[in-house]
Amino acid sequence: MFLNSLKLKDFRNYKSLQVDFSNSINVLIGDNAQGKTNLLEAIYILSMARSHRDNNDRDLINWSSDFSDITGEVQSKMGKFPLEVRITRTGKKVFVNHLTENRLSDYIGNLHTVLFAPEDLDLVKGSPGVRRKFIDSEFGQMSANYLFNLLQYRSVLKNRNAYLKNIKWIGNNPKIDEDYLKVLNDQLIDFGSEIIFQRFVLVKELEKYSYQIHKAISRNEKLTIKYASFSGIDDQSTKEEISKIFNNQLLKNKTRELFLKSTSVGPHHDDLKFSINGKEVGSFASQGQQRTTALSVRLAEIEMMKYETGEYPILLLDDVLSELDGDRQTQLLNFIQDKVQTFLTTTSLSDVERDLIKDPKIYQVKGGTLVNG
């Protein structure tokens, strides 16, 4: 899979841009705050219909305009076709082959991307929310069914939390519509159990690829990745067993949730556990081991996406070479060479990096403009 070209209109600091890309490695060189990361962000939005770093779409629009437009030509096993994301002050629309897609689940999956940025260290040492965002973002690109269940679950969760928040109390007694709460619980269990079951399957697959890559670049250290959900659930559990335990947990925590006014159990509270030789990475590993783990997982993601979709994704490397030592730089660049279209940002390329990258297409980025370097 390749992104042949990109057009930006009033996106961040880009008033207008039209650029063609190499199917190999594209290097974006420039000082800080010139637009390198903005360009990677535009490609990510074209893939996922949302930013990886900003929750407010209005901030993506150039200050002098009322809308922003991102258009790209994708080349995949399905042929060539345009994707477009149009962002206004009041919302956004997405288009595939010039036709509006009303459902996000139908749009995502047309352009597969893997993003690797310095903050990916948070993947192993950050909060569980960072890791949930990672698996939802990547698994959602690989599986339309996973994405559908995830979006439905989030919708039901939002409705359930709103209901819990608005329950009126008379003294110590809440006035509950038990029938309505049961409908919400049943929907939450249905979609949530599917998510948990699929996460176990996909995390097991991710662990398989990560283990082999990590072993090769870490002198035979053994990396394990485990999905942590409800007590009593593991990767051998059936959907029926997961549903039963989920239901029991909701019943057990009912009083607590009425006081909290939010849903305290479910896959939106689950986590990933990374271990090297049996020791938890976030707590006991060195910074070098944490970086090797993050790198291994991202490279595994590329291979897993190839296996699941039949095509390599596009790789977005946002200023990560400066965060990696020479050995890890070599491992990364050798891995992607000649098989993955890559977009790499940096303030400068060292002589070593230039030797490692074969025939890169270099762009100089300055003030929202690109010039072939």
Swiss-Prot record:
Keywords: ATP-binding, Cytoplasm, DNA damage, DNA repair, DNA replication, DNA-binding, Nucleotide-binding, SOS response. One of its GO terms (molecular function) is ATP binding. CDD domains: ABC_RecF. Its main location: cytoplasm. ATP binds at residues 30-37. It is found in: Cytoplasm. Pfam families: SMC_N (PF02463). One of its GO terms (biological process) is DNA synthesis involved in DNA repair. InterPro entries: DNA-binding_RecF, DNA-binding_RecF_CS, P-loop_NTPase, RecF/RecN/SMC_N, RecF_2. The RecF protein is involved in DNA metabolism; it is required for DNA replication and normal SOS inducibility. RecF binds preferentially to single-stranded, linear DNA. It also seems to bind ATP. Belongs to the RecF family. This is DNA replication and repair protein RecF. The gene is recF.
